[in-house]
Amino acid sequence: MIRDTKQPIKVPAKPASRSGGKAKTVKPKTIKPKTSAKAAAAKPASAKGLKGVIAVAPPSFRRERALIKRGIWPIAGCDEAGRGPLAGPVVAAAVVLDPKRVPKGLDDSKRLSAEKREALFEEICATAQVSVVYASPERINRDNILRASLWALTRAVHALPDLPRHVFVDGRDRLATKCDCEAVIGGDGLIASIAAASIIAKVSRDRLMCKLAEQCPGYGFEQHKGYGVPEHLDALARLGPTVHHRRFFAPVAAAWQKIEGAPPPQIRDLFEADVTVEATA
């Protein structure tokens, strides 16, 4: 018979002695199940409502400082933005942070509000070396999104004022750079230099998509930044694709097929942008 180990186990009383003396009455003992150390440790947390709470530490500058102590400098972090949208370029950024002026609040750009990203963008550009490279939709169509992204990331590293001796890149793919390159999965949430690059890439691309929204009204680029949300798909079906849409995505390809005799237009393969920051009092 299988017992529920959570229920107390009652031990029956011993039978009365057959000797001439009086039988002693033994009260049944109650044995409580033992609580394991793990269960005991988990109990207070559960009682306080902390069960399932995971603390996420912000990116740090520790790995950069470890390399600096070994005499390795400059050290860059690089990341990209815009792999998944239906429209617009993929934007890569490389950043060399000043060890004495690492901005506070750095984090993966996806975990920050737009206002926080904008503020950090200004601070990073004012205190660090920054480069930004845009890979056009035409290059994405020709090479595929992965190759276009790696190409832009590599160009961003080589476009820095001083070629770094070591590069941290977000993801699993190392770059074909002239310096040592270390790929770090989830690096934008671990390494400060990569987090800074993710912010520069994200804000640069968002600003560009807002400019494209002025050139292509009706698509809502300023809202969804080219991602395949229902509003964008609806506009694509009504208005057709633009020169900024990526042809290999199924919704865009279907939209082109509806336009008889109209070949997809070609656009500039690459354009690089210098990050400019207006001086603030």
UniProtKB/Swiss-Prot annotation:
The keyword Hydrolase applies. A divalent metal cation binds at D79, E80, D170. Its EC number is 3.1.26.4. PROSITE patterns: RNASE_H_2. GO terms for cellular component: cytoplasm; ribonuclease H2 complex. It is found in: Cytoplasm. Manganese or magnesium. Binds 1 divalent metal ion per monomer in the absence of substrate. May bind a second metal ion after substrate binding. GO terms for biological process: DNA replication, removal of RNA primer; mismatch repair. Residues 1-46 are annotated as: Disordered. It catalyses: Endonucleolytic cleavage to 5'-phosphomonoester. It comes from the Bacteria. Its main location: cytoplasm. Residues 73-261 form the RNase H type-2 domain. Its cofactor is Mn(2+); Mg(2+). Keywords: Cytoplasm, Endonuclease, Hydrolase, Manganese, Metal-binding, Nuclease. It holds the Pfam family RNase_HII. HAMAP family: RNase_HII_B. Belongs to the RNase HII family. Endonuclease that specifically degrades the RNA of RNA-DNA hybrids. PANTHER family: RIBONUCLEASE H2 SUBUNIT A (PTHR10954), RIBONUCLEASE HII (PTHR10954:SF18). This is Ribonuclease HII.
